[in-house]
Design a protein with these regions (language model features):
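Acetyl-CoA-dependent GNAT
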Residues: 2, 6-82, 91-101, 131, ...
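Short acidic/glycine-enriched loop/turn segments that link adjacent beta-strands
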Residues: 39, 66, 114, 138-142
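Loop/turn elements at beta-strand to alpha-helix junctions within RNA-recognition modules
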Residues: 78, 111-114
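Conserved G/P- and acidic residue-centered "switch" motifs that form tight phosphate/ATP-binding loops
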Residues: 85-87
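Short glycine/proline-centered loop/turn elements that form peptide/ligand docking sites
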Residues: 91, 114-117, 134-139
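Conserved GNAT acetyl-CoA-binding A-motif
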Residues: 98-109, 120
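Conserved catalytic-core motifs of GNAT/GCN5-like acyltransferases
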Residues: 107-109, 122, 127-146
Length: 173
Protein backbone atom coordinates (compact mmCIF):
# COMPACT_ATOMS: atom_id res chain seq x y z
CA UNK A 1 0.00 0.00 0.00
CA UNK A 2 1.24 3.49 -0.82
CA UNK A 3 1.97 5.52 2.30
CA UNK A 4 2.02 9.28 2.82
CA UNK A 5 4.05 10.14 5.89
CA UNK A 6 6.30 12.82 7.35
CA UNK A 7 9.71 13.12 5.71
CA UNK A 8 12.62 11.84 7.83
CA UNK A 9 16.39 12.33 7.70
CA UNK A 10 16.76 8.78 6.36
CA UNK A 11 14.70 9.76 3.32
CA UNK A 12 17.53 12.02 2.17
CA UNK A 13 19.54 8.87 1.49
CA UNK A 14 16.94 7.42 -0.87
CA UNK A 15 15.24 10.22 -2.79
CA UNK A 16 17.74 10.59 -5.65
CA UNK A 17 15.40 8.78 -8.07
CA UNK A 18 12.94 11.63 -7.58
CA UNK A 19 15.49 14.44 -7.68
CA UNK A 20 17.04 13.35 -11.00
CA UNK A 21 14.22 15.02 -12.93
CA UNK A 22 15.66 18.10 -14.72
CA UNK A 23 12.66 20.24 -13.66
CA UNK A 24 13.16 19.41 -9.98
CA UNK A 25 15.10 22.00 -8.03
CA UNK A 26 17.66 20.28 -5.82
CA UNK A 27 19.36 21.59 -2.72
CA UNK A 28 22.18 20.67 -0.36
CA UNK A 29 21.50 18.34 2.55
CA UNK A 30 21.69 21.21 5.04
CA UNK A 31 18.82 22.94 3.23
CA UNK A 32 16.61 19.86 3.56
CA UNK A 33 17.51 19.38 7.22
CA UNK A 34 16.76 23.04 7.95
CA UNK A 35 13.25 22.62 6.53
CA UNK A 36 12.79 19.35 8.37
CA UNK A 37 13.79 21.00 11.66
CA UNK A 38 11.73 24.19 11.24
CA UNK A 39 8.64 23.06 9.31
CA UNK A 40 8.30 19.27 9.67
CA UNK A 41 4.54 19.33 9.10
CA UNK A 42 5.16 20.91 5.67
CA UNK A 43 7.56 18.14 4.61
CA UNK A 44 5.77 14.97 3.46
CA UNK A 45 6.79 11.96 1.40
CA UNK A 46 4.92 9.35 -0.64
CA UNK A 47 6.43 5.90 -0.27
CA UNK A 48 5.72 2.77 -2.31
CA UNK A 49 5.02 -0.61 -0.66
CA UNK A 50 8.64 -1.57 -1.42
CA UNK A 51 9.97 1.53 0.39
CA UNK A 52 10.83 3.54 -2.72
CA UNK A 53 10.29 7.30 -2.54
CA UNK A 54 7.61 8.12 -5.11
CA UNK A 55 7.52 11.86 -4.43
CA UNK A 56 7.67 14.54 -1.79
CA UNK A 57 6.62 18.06 -0.92
CA UNK A 58 8.65 20.53 1.09
CA UNK A 59 7.30 23.85 2.27
CA UNK A 60 7.17 26.40 5.04
CA UNK A 61 5.09 29.07 6.72
CA UNK A 62 6.31 32.62 6.24
CA UNK A 63 5.32 36.28 6.07
CA UNK A 64 3.46 38.44 8.54
CA UNK A 65 0.14 40.21 8.74
CA UNK A 66 -2.04 39.62 5.70
CA UNK A 67 1.02 38.20 3.92
CA UNK A 68 1.17 35.19 6.32
CA UNK A 69 1.14 32.17 4.03
CA UNK A 70 2.19 28.64 3.28
CA UNK A 71 4.89 28.30 0.65
CA UNK A 72 5.66 25.29 -1.54
CA UNK A 73 9.44 25.14 -1.81
CA UNK A 74 9.58 21.88 -3.74
CA UNK A 75 7.07 19.39 -5.09
CA UNK A 76 8.22 16.46 -7.15
CA UNK A 77 6.99 13.04 -8.15
CA UNK A 78 9.20 10.39 -9.76
CA UNK A 79 8.49 10.02 -13.51
CA UNK A 80 7.44 6.40 -12.87
CA UNK A 81 4.59 7.57 -10.63
CA UNK A 82 3.25 10.65 -12.41
CA UNK A 83 -0.36 11.10 -13.48
CA UNK A 84 -1.60 9.14 -10.44
CA UNK A 85 -2.75 12.18 -8.47
CA UNK A 86 0.16 12.08 -6.02
CA UNK A 87 1.16 15.71 -6.60
CA UNK A 88 -2.42 16.85 -6.01
CA UNK A 89 -2.59 14.78 -2.82
CA UNK A 90 0.65 16.30 -1.54
CA UNK A 91 -0.56 19.81 -2.41
CA UNK A 92 -3.81 19.18 -0.52
CA UNK A 93 -1.83 18.16 2.56
CA UNK A 94 0.26 21.34 2.42
CA UNK A 95 -2.88 23.42 1.95
CA UNK A 96 -4.51 21.76 4.98
CA UNK A 97 -1.43 22.49 7.10
CA UNK A 98 -1.52 26.11 5.90
CA UNK A 99 -5.20 26.37 6.85
CA UNK A 100 -4.39 25.07 10.34
CA UNK A 101 -1.62 27.67 10.59
CA UNK A 102 -4.25 30.32 9.73
CA UNK A 103 -2.54 31.34 6.49
CA UNK A 104 -4.11 33.76 4.03
CA UNK A 105 -2.84 31.88 0.98
CA UNK A 106 -0.47 29.25 -0.36
CA UNK A 107 2.07 30.22 -2.99
CA UNK A 108 4.73 28.60 -5.14
CA UNK A 109 7.14 29.46 -7.92
CA UNK A 110 7.22 27.53 -11.18
CA UNK A 111 9.27 27.93 -14.34
CA UNK A 112 7.25 29.64 -17.08
CA UNK A 113 8.36 26.83 -19.42
CA UNK A 114 6.91 24.09 -17.18
CA UNK A 115 3.49 24.01 -18.84
CA UNK A 116 2.49 20.64 -17.37
CA UNK A 117 3.03 21.87 -13.81
CA UNK A 118 1.35 25.22 -14.51
CA UNK A 119 -1.75 23.45 -15.84
CA UNK A 120 -1.81 21.10 -12.85
CA UNK A 121 -1.64 24.03 -10.43
CA UNK A 122 -4.40 25.85 -12.32
CA UNK A 123 -6.56 22.72 -12.08
CA UNK A 124 -5.93 22.76 -8.32
CA UNK A 125 -7.26 26.33 -8.12
CA UNK A 126 -4.03 28.35 -8.30
CA UNK A 127 -3.76 31.55 -10.32
CA UNK A 128 -0.74 33.32 -11.78
CA UNK A 129 -0.31 36.15 -9.29
CA UNK A 130 2.76 37.70 -10.93
CA UNK A 131 5.81 37.01 -13.08
CA UNK A 132 9.21 37.09 -11.39
CA UNK A 133 11.88 37.99 -13.95
CA UNK A 134 15.01 35.82 -14.15
CA UNK A 135 14.07 33.92 -10.97
CA UNK A 136 15.77 30.67 -12.00
CA UNK A 137 19.52 30.75 -12.65
CA UNK A 138 20.70 29.30 -15.92
CA UNK A 139 22.00 30.15 -19.34
CA UNK A 140 19.87 32.09 -19.91
CA UNK A 141 18.06 32.77 -16.62
CA UNK A 142 14.38 31.84 -16.67
CA UNK A 143 11.33 33.70 -15.41
CA UNK A 144 8.99 32.18 -12.85
CA UNK A 145 5.31 32.47 -12.19
CA UNK A 146 4.37 33.17 -8.60
CA UNK A 147 1.15 31.16 -8.35
CA UNK A 148 -1.28 31.52 -5.45
CA UNK A 149 -4.39 30.00 -3.98
CA UNK A 150 -6.37 31.80 -1.29
CA UNK A 151 -7.07 30.06 2.01
CA UNK A 152 -10.36 30.42 3.87
CA UNK A 153 -8.95 33.20 6.07
CA UNK A 154 -8.73 35.47 3.00
CA UNK A 155 -12.48 35.93 2.75
CA UNK A 156 -12.24 38.70 0.14
CA UNK A 157 -9.51 36.88 -1.86
CA UNK A 158 -7.24 39.94 -1.77
CA UNK A 159 -4.13 37.74 -1.83
CA UNK A 160 -4.95 36.41 -5.29
CA UNK A 161 -5.63 39.63 -7.18
CA UNK A 162 -2.99 39.37 -9.94
CA UNK A 163 -0.35 42.06 -10.32
CA UNK A 164 -0.21 43.66 -13.74
CA UNK A 165 3.56 44.12 -13.88
CA UNK A 166 6.49 41.73 -13.44
CA UNK A 167 8.87 41.99 -10.49
CA UNK A 168 12.53 41.20 -9.90
CA UNK A 169 13.58 38.42 -7.48
CA UNK A 170 14.86 40.99 -4.97
CA UNK A 171 11.37 42.54 -4.87
CA UNK A 172 9.65 39.29 -3.86
CA UNK A 173 8.56 39.47 -0.24
Amino acid sequence: MTTIRPFTCEDMLKFNNVNLDPLTETYGLSFYTQYLAHWPEYFQVVESPSGEIMGYIMGKAEGHGDNWHGHVTALTVSPDYRRLGLAATLMNILEEVSEKKNAYFVDLFVRVSNKVAINMYKNLGYIVYRTVLEYYSGDPDEDAYDMRKACSRDVNKKSVIPLTHPVRPEDVD
